[in-house]
Amino acid sequence: MKEQLNQLAKTLEGDLFFDKMIRTLYATDASSYREFPLAVAIPKTKQDISKLIAFASTHQTSLIPRTAGTSLAGQVVGNGIIVDVSKHFNQILELNKEEGWVRVQPGVIRDELNLFLQPHGLFFGPETSTANRAMIGGMVGNNSCGSNSVVYRSTREHLIEVKAFLSHIGVIIVVTATITIIAV
């Protein structure tokens, strides 16, 4: 499989790591689970994500989307290829104050989103204990909520639209999410 991974790496604009050090860094999240991935991909473009999905399908391995890795339940730990979208998919794309929504990429940090929204008198309600590093893609994947969820509900209840990559083997990698925001 190492030769196939080498060939894949040559086709990506982003990075693909399969050395022990990087795999060790991604073998855990904030949970107590530990499993070494086959490789770690840091895609730079949507085309990179398409190539990763095709590779995983051809070689019958899994893709595990990951942002900050703050989950306490091991959702982003596995023996497939970790796809870390936090580095290059981290932009706030559009704000519509009138309709009360914002479109973001999955690597946007929840607290940084609220800092962006604050001057507009708006905020994104769902909160986690790791809101200063939790990213929207992970919050969507985990349906995050927190101590204020009684008032502001969970993440899924704020989700209007998700643009994602899908494959016939069930891979879903979110590339943008449109979420509702609340006036202060």
Q: Language-model segments: which ranges?
A:
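N-terminal accessory segments
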Residues: 1-30, 55-63
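N-terminal glycine-rich flavin-associated loop
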Residues: 8, 31-63, 85-128, 140, ...
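A short, glycine/Asx- and small/polar-enriched loop/turn
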Residues: 34-35, 76-81
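Conserved PLP cofactor-binding pocket of PLP-dependent enzymes
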Residues: 66
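Conserved PLP phosphate-binding loop immediately N-terminal to the Schiff-base lysine helix
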Residues: 74, 130
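Beta-rich nucleic-acid/ligand-interaction surfaces
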Residues: 133-137
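Low-complexity, simple-sequence tandem-repeat tracts enriched in small residues
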Residues: 181-182
